[in-house]
Amino acid sequence: MKIEKVQIKNFKSLRDIEIVLRGFTLITGVNSSGKSTFIQSLLLLKENRELINQIATNSMMMSSLGEHPEPLKTHIFKLVEDTKKQPISLEGEYIHLGDKKDIFNQEVYEEDISILINTLPLKEINFTINYNNLSLSSTTQIPLSNVINLFSDDFQYLNTDRIQPDRTYELSEKHIRKNLIGTKGEYTAHYLYENRDRPLNIKALKHENTKTDRLLDNVSFWLSEISNGVKVLPKKHLDTHQASLSYQYTYGENTTNEYSPLNVGFGITYVLPIIVSILKSKPDDLLIIENPESHLHPVGQSKIAKLCAIAVANGVQIIVESHSDHFLNAIRVATKEDILKPEDSAIYYFSKIADSMETKVEQLLIDANGKINQNWPKGFFDEYDNQLDKLISW
């Protein structure tokens, strides 16, 4: 199920905020205002999903204690108590949060962290992190892997530090089996090789210029929207247990030799995991992307936003952190062109409360004409106008 709302208390700079998520949710704002902290709150739960599921399993066992013999009851009691004492993990595949002092709000330091998630259809689950021992408690009584898309094996997070052009890349059978490409997209080459003939789950994501719904064909055609005529070629090298990428360009009737990622534009490889993540998605999946605009020309930024819009219109839930006005405007255009409905998207502007380290969050909505009718907060994509005013005044 999709996440409908998240309420967070006492996590880093997030003293008490509420975010209503839509199909597409854009997180933006000034630097160091709490945007990544919001994403980290979700990743913290994802990182500790096994502990959360154990808590749920314990709850189910406790509810049926009367049916078991005494020795088994004693064992269950011990298991439950041991789980209660187990601290959450602050380091792992999804998060690198440091230690206890780094995650609690400094202005109310001795209060527990609370993260409340509402799902669709409406179901409320509260997670509490104890200030004293970092133990986790939860109101869920069932394992969440099949209940909330955040805990699904198909959840994909791409942080801003993605793979760069290189001669070879890692293999990971574990990630490929789980339909994942890594938080940096580091297994993208391996994934593309193994799944090159796999049909798209969402037919609407098929590029208009390709005749097939093969993943690799569509990745190349969407990539060519960013660099005209490019084709990506993944390879797997069993002798070195590595994967590689190369690129070819087609112009007219001609095709170039294969080029290493080191010999084409940096942004081509940097955006590749984003395109793959969107094209491999299916309805109800959750995808979180940080700074998709990095190293892309404005046209490329707009194309990625349009691809996101098509995925959202077909049931994927996407959270994007971005500073790009081109990305925002492309989502507005997608709404005006009826790819997205107004209720499909929400924008949140993060800033800091004056004379405080506390995050302030303001919601903005896009109407059917692509307009943002609320007053734009100071700092919300207004720098173009600020600089233009200075030019005009000369």
Listing of model-derived features with the role each one plays in the protein:
Residues 42-49, 278-280, 306-310:
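Walker A/P-loop NTP-binding motif
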Residues 11-13, 26, 32-33, 162-165, ...:
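Short, solvent-exposed loop/turn segments at secondary-structure junctions
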Residues 289-292:
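Walker B catalytic motif
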Residues 1-50, 54-65, 297:
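Pre-Walker A-like glycine/lysine-rich segment at the N-terminus of P-loop NTPase domains
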